[in-house]
Amino acid sequence: MSHEHVNFPVYGQVDYFKQQQPQQPQYNPHLGGKQKTLDPIVTGTSVIAIKYDKGVVMGSDMLLSYGSLARFNSTERMKKFGGYTIVGASGEYSDFQSITNTLNDLVTDDHCMDDGSKLSSEEIWNYLARVLYNQRNRGNPLWNTLVVMGYQGGKSFLGKVDLVGTCYKDDIITTGYGSHIALPLLRKARDENPNMNLEQAKQLIQDCLRVLFYRDARSSKKIQISVAGEEGIEISGPIELDTFHWNSGEAAVKNFSQV
């Protein structure tokens, strides 16, 4: 009876680690670079907005975080489009830059039509919902949650679109960590004062952003507030929130040091 020689793996002679490694992707210069990301890298946190009696107010901080590093602290996350609309964004900032370019092209094309009408806030909101849903179906979503607000023809508009194209309209909109912290505060204030004026709405937004600064590790106390109302649309300059005065504990520290 003949015995066939069988080669069994011998410890130390087989590189199991090398065999388990995935095949490395080969660079193809004809494919070009990837333009959009599947992983958020430089991100912004919450955007919050509420309707008041004659318009809409929206607020956000100006911090962009590189992972957990507070990297860029003076960046606008709200942009004007046309004469009636402001869009605020949380999430990946490079994707928001791509969306900004797309909307600027849309507004330019609409202006070139010269038909006497301008894009409304609701039309821009619907367009963004289709764009984000299309990118999601391609498996390459734009990693943003967008808040669209505007005022036209005596009517206020406030809507939201997320990274998979889900969209809805409401009187109060929040994104990010603000959906957990700021949303209950905004709802309570609106229930107590359903016809708040502009100054009350601005103060409410500032108070909510102050709470988010205390509770959200990705936020800052440098903020911007946008208004869409009878006098048009406006984005404020940087506002520094007055926060808790930590020197109030100096007396306790001095007493403790004497013990």
Curated annotation (Swiss-Prot):
Pfam families for this protein: Proteasome
Record has Cytoplasm as a keyword: yes
Keyword Cytoplasm among UniProt keywords: yes
One GO term describing the cellular component: nucleus
Subcellular location: Cytoplasm; Nucleus
Top-level taxon of origin: Eukaryota
PROSITE patterns with a match to the protein in the record: PROTEASOME_BETA_1 (PS00854), PROTEASOME_BETA_2 (PS51476)
GO biological processes: proteasomal protein catabolic process; proteasome-mediated ubiquitin-dependent protein catabolic process
Keywords for the protein's UniProt record, in alphabetical order: Cytoplasm, Nucleus, Proteasome
UniProt main location, coarse: cytoplasm
Family named by the database record: Belongs to the peptidase T1B family.
Subunit organization: The 26S proteasome consists of a 20S proteasome core and two 19S regulatory subunits. The 20S proteasome core is composed of 28 subunits that are arranged in four stacked rings, resulting in a barrel-shaped structure. The two end rings are each formed by seven alpha subunits, and the two central rings are each formed by seven beta subunits. The catalytic chamber with the active sites is on the inside of the barrel.
Function according to Swiss-Prot or TrEMBL: Non-catalytic component of the proteasome, a multicatalytic proteinase complex which is characterized by its ability to cleave peptides with Arg, Phe, Tyr, Leu, and Glu adjacent to the leaving group at neutral or slightly basic pH. The proteasome has an ATP-dependent proteolytic activity.
Name of the protein this chain belongs to: Proteasome subunit beta type-4
Species classification: Eukaryota, Amoebozoa, Evosea, Eumycetozoa, Dictyostelia
Gene from which the chain derives: psmB4-1
